[in-house]
Amino acid sequence: MAKQIYDSMAMKRALTRMTYEIIEKNKGIDDLVLVGIKTRGVYLAQRIADRLKQLENAEVPVGQLDITLYRDDRHDASLAQDPVVNEADLGFDIKDKHVILVDDVLFTGRTIRAALDALMDIGRPKKINLAVLVDRGHRELPIRADFVGKNIPTAMDEQVAVYVDEVDGKDGIELKKL
């Protein structure tokens, strides 16, 4: 049984608030680039970029990162398939840029650590911040998000499901028992 945490409108409000926080913390959007972690992080990054364009009247580049090659927890049942090795599709240089890494859910921190490794293999950004729609706790590594849409404390037998219209045909966040 799933419990709805956010509907489409609440999710839109959270992303808008995160966008304002990004602008405020960075005193504008100079040298800012967004990098979404596949799959849902890419769509969330694009939505933040669209909102930045509306608010600041400037384009912010959006790239995507597939970190499956870098994961150190392949023994996990959810990654039982052979990993797909894809190049990072940034389309821009991250050297001396302020990178906002975007993902849907922050859990153990392992995906983010892997994404940081991948980014550092690509180039040397001036700064990296982390934006996540949901922080569910249970960190295994010392990683913290700078911009959070919603903190959702969870039990280990629960799962946070983020839905984006581009992939799932709807927007929303649900909490499910495993």
Curated annotation (Swiss-Prot):
Keywords carried by this UniProt record: Glycosyltransferase, RNA-binding, Transcription, Transcription regulation, Transcription termination, Transferase
Gene3D superfamilies named among the record's database cross-references: 3.40.50.2020
Q: Name one GO biological process term.
A: DNA-templated transcription termination
SUPFAM superfamilies in the record: PRTase-like
Q: What is this protein called?
A: Bifunctional protein PyrR
Q: Which organism is it from?
A: Ligilactobacillus salivarius (strain UCC118)
Please give the subunit comment from the record. Homodimer and homohexamer; in equilibrium.
Q: Where is this motif: PRPP-binding?
A: 99-111
- Write down the EC number: 2.4.2.9
Q: What does this protein do?
A: Regulates transcriptional attenuation of the pyrimidine nucleotide (pyr) operon by binding in a uridine-dependent manner to specific sites on pyr mRNA. This disrupts an antiterminator hairpin in the RNA and favors formation of a downstream transcription terminator, leading to a reduced expression of downstream genes. Also displays a weak uracil phosphoribosyltransferase activity which is not physiologically significant.
Catalytic activity annotation:
UMP + diphosphate = 5-phospho-alpha-D-ribose 1-diphosphate + uracil
Q: Which Pfam families match?
A: Pribosyltran (PF00156)
Say which family it is in: Belongs to the purine/pyrimidine phosphoribosyltransferase family. PyrR subfamily.
Query: Which GO MF terms are attached to this record?
Result: RNA binding; uracil phosphoribosyltransferase activity
